[in-house]
């Protein structure tokens, strides 16, 4: 009886190709991305190749370590420009509240527009590194530098507190304009404050770090003055009735 020889299976020898160091991806991406960031934020002519930049950056996003390194570089570079923009407003702190809010609003919306364009060419708007995305840059950088720019911060605070005082004094302040309206009230465009809410890192305005204590102090001052005025203008029974009603 003839036997069929066994089948031999040959496995091709595939040479091992070492995986490229992730730092190379970061270096390649940053070489292209850094001048692009500068051009975007300084409104310079944009002569970079968007497709090549997009591909280089996306290689860095593929690994956690390289993605974190690139995110840090982007954060530090963008911080230079948002810091300079907010600091430039310090010379405008003596202007009319309406004009000041217009300048601050323009600064914030301009930064968001440029950041959105950066995300579109770097593939970063939905790209997360840990819990963060490149889009979170605006939420991290803007309040940080607003709170550290004392003159700008205090000017904005005084405008908001004055609006609150006027409202509590039953003056014609339509606070609903904080929600997407455009009419000017008392020479201050309330829609600007609505646009500026992003400066508070998504927090309630009254819980934001720089606003909470001054707001409470303002409330105490206002109601103390109101109580004193009512006491001076009313007899004791009416005053006690008022206290009981407020309590």
From Swiss-Prot:
<protein>
    <recommendedName>
        <fullName>Putative cullin-like protein 4</fullName>
    </recommendedName>
</protein>
<dbReference type="GO" id="GO:0006511">
    <property type="term" value="P:ubiquitin-dependent protein catabolic process"/>
</dbReference>
<dbReference type="InterPro" id="IPR016159">
    <property type="entry name" value="Cullin_repeat-like_dom_sf"/>
</dbReference>
<dbReference type="InterPro" id="IPR001373">
    <property type="entry name" value="Cullin_N"/>
</dbReference>
<dbReference type="InterPro" id="IPR045093">
    <property type="entry name" value="Cullin"/>
</dbReference>
<dbReference type="GO" id="GO:0031625">
    <property type="term" value="F:ubiquitin protein ligase binding"/>
</dbReference>
<dbReference type="Pfam" id="PF00888">
    <property type="entry name" value="Cullin"/>
</dbReference>
<comment type="similarity">
    <text>Belongs to the cullin family.</text>
</comment>
């Amino acid at each position: 009886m003839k036997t069929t020889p066994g089948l031999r299976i040959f496995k091709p020898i595939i040479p091992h190709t070492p995986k490229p160091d992730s730092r190379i991806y970061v270096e390649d991406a940053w070489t292209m991305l850094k001048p692009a960031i500068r051009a975007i934020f300084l409104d310079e002519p944009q002569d970079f190749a968007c497709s090549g930049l997009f591909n280089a950056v996306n290689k860095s996003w593929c690994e956690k370590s390289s993605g974190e390194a690139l995110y840090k570089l982007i954060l530090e570079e963008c911080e230079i420009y948002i810091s300079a923009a907010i600091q430039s407003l310090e010379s405008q702190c003596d202007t009319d509240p309406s004009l000041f809010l217009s300048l601050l609003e323009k600064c914030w919306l301009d930064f968001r527009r440029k950041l959105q364009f950066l995300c579109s060419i770097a593939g970063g708007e939905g790209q997360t590194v840990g819990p963060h995305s490149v889009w979170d840059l605006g939420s991290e950088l803007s309040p940080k530098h607003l709170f550290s720019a004392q003159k700008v911060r205090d000017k904005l605070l005084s405008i908001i507190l004055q609006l609150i005082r006027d409202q509590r004094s039953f003056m014609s302040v339509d606070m609903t304009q904080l929600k997407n309206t455009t009419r000017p009230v008392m020479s201050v465009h309330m829609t600007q404050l609505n646009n500026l809410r992003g400066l508070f890192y998504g927090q309630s305005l009254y819980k934001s770090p720089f606003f909470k204590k001054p707001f409470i102090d303002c409330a105490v001052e206002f109601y103390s003055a109101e109580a004193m005025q009512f006491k001076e203008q009313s007899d004791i029974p009416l005053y006690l009735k008022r206290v009981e009603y407020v309590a």
